[in-house]
Amino acid sequence: MNIILMGLPGAGKGTQASEIVKKFPIPHISTGDMFRKAIKEETELGKEAKSYMDRGELVPDEVTVGIVKERISEDDAKKGFLLDGFPRTIEQAEALNNIMSELDRNIDAVINIEVPEEELMNRLTGRRICESCGTTYHLVFNPPKVEGICDIDGGKLYQREDDNPETVANRLSVNIKQSKPILDFYDQKGVLKNIDGSKDISDVTKDVIDILDHL
């Protein structure tokens, strides 16, 4: 079972990824984890990726794609994987398609967690962090007992700069633009499964598991 998990920031991908790997014996493979593993193990591609990152440059697609191929070819991923954070561009989607053909495997489902933009704005702009202990709160989902004050140590709560409405709106806009051609690509292949991510977490999980159970 080879799955790609997609969704905009704030859609709850991390939560659903945890639930999927609890139910199915496949590794959750995120782009960040892949890079860290390749760099730590000092593979040729890992060294190459590190040299770009050390210079503050974007890692080129051919290096990223190579690292993905290495990772999904490992023993623990031979019976399937949950890919999160890749592909990010249509070129990467096409490259992944080629890799899967070379490995004589298929992408079985692309799970896309859909949440209305307004709801994502509420989720992402509501985060508050204690400036002394780092505890995270949410104004709607996990508010402090006293507004603006940490329950644990009485520290002042602040909003991260990248959680302000303007920054969040820009981030969502960029992500929507980037993800549309990828979603269209997988829709044409008949593997795109859209999930309503605005439901309760347990209901979203049930919908995801139902789809995967029927693959």
From Swiss-Prot:
Coiled coil: none annotated. One of its GO terms (cellular component) is cytoplasm. Residues 30-59 are annotated as: NMP. Residues 126-163 are annotated as: LID. PROSITE patterns: ADENYLATE_KINASE. It holds the Pfam family ADK_lid. ATP binds at residues 10-15, 127, 136-137, 199. Zn(2+) binds at residues 130, 133, 150, 153. It comes from the Bacteria. It is found in: Cytoplasm. Pathway: Purine metabolism; AMP biosynthesis via salvage pathway; AMP from ADP: step 1/1. GO terms for molecular function: adenylate kinase activity; ATP binding; zinc ion binding. Keywords: ATP-binding, Cytoplasm, Kinase, Metal-binding, Nucleotide biosynthesis, Nucleotide-binding, Transferase, Zinc. InterPro entries: Adenyl_kin_sub, Adenylat/UMP-CMP_kin, Adenylat_kinase_CS, Adenylate_kinase_lid-dom, Guanylate_kin-like_dom, P-loop_NTPase. Monomer. Belongs to the adenylate kinase family. Catalyzes the reversible transfer of the terminal phosphate group between ATP and AMP. Plays an important role in cellular energy homeostasis and in adenine nucleotide metabolism. Consists of three domains, a large central CORE domain and two small peripheral domains, NMPbind and LID, which undergo movements during catalysis. The LID domain closes over the site of phosphoryl transfer upon ATP binding. Assembling and dissambling the active center during each catalytic cycle provides an effective means to prevent ATP hydrolysis. Some bacteria have evolved a zinc-coordinating structure that stabilizes the LID domain. This is Adenylate kinase. It comes from Staphylococcus aureus (strain Mu50 / ATCC 700699). The lineage of its organism: Bacteria, Bacillati, Bacillota, Bacilli, Bacillales. The gene is adk.
